[in-house]
Amino acid sequence: TGRKTESEKELNYVLRAIDSWCEIAKKILREPESLSTSIPVLKLQNHYEPFPLVGVISGWCFPFAHLMKEIIPALLAGSAVIAKPSSITPRFVRTLNHTIHRTRGLREVLSIVEGTDDILEPLCSNSDFVCYNGTATEARQVSDIAHQLFKPSSIQHGLKNTVIVTETADLENASSAILLGGFWNAGQSSSSIERVYVHRNVYHFLFYRIQFKSDFTK
């Protein structure tokens, strides 16, 4: 997209996410201990069974990070993954596919496909679990398809995120947080701030602090 800083941070986020999920997987995927019952000869044992194929559909905002945040835990859980990034932001797909195809063991379980909304239904119908991360409009579409096919799904989409500033809030921190949340990635983020509600007694001071700091924002 031409924004070097955001692209670097997006890549670094994915690298940190890989490390973080690997640590989490060590804990939650550990073989559970047998549980005793009231019958001495009978014990209970939990076994984890991954979904054979997880379908991932991601939006155009932070396209690489939002795609990988769904792929990483699915692979660690033992599932194969077929993923469709947004057709609006496809430039990273060729590089990602090149890396996947060069990596033994990964190319057998991970496939990145390109396409428009026309492939949403076949992708969902061939998946055992559907993950979506993107816009609210497309989230409804994916959710409807998954429900009609009786597919379990995880749907995450952007909302009108709100900040509430109370009378006793730290206004310096609040003004900086509002600017960061509103301007990060030029405001194109599923977690960007859309509304700010401020206590009337601190409204004017907060307004002028935001105005002052925004003059230095590039």
Predicted feature locations:
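A structured beta-alpha segment of the ubiquitous adenosine-cofactor-binding alpha/beta core
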Residues: K43-L44, S111-F129
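Conserved small-residue-rich beta-alpha loop and adjacent elements
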Residues: L35-T103
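N-terminal Rossmann-like NAD(P)+-binding subdomain of aldehyde/semialdehyde dehydrogenases
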Residues: T1-L42
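Periplasmic-binding protein-like
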Residues: I72, F129-N133
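ALDH superfamily catalytic-core signature
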Residues: R104, D128-F129, T137-K218
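Short acidic capping loops at alpha-helix termini that bridge into adjacent secondary structure
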Residues: L53, R107-L110
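Beta-loop-alpha module in the N-terminal Rossmann-like domain of NAD(P)-dependent dehydrogenases
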Residues: V54, C61, E114-P122, G134-Q141
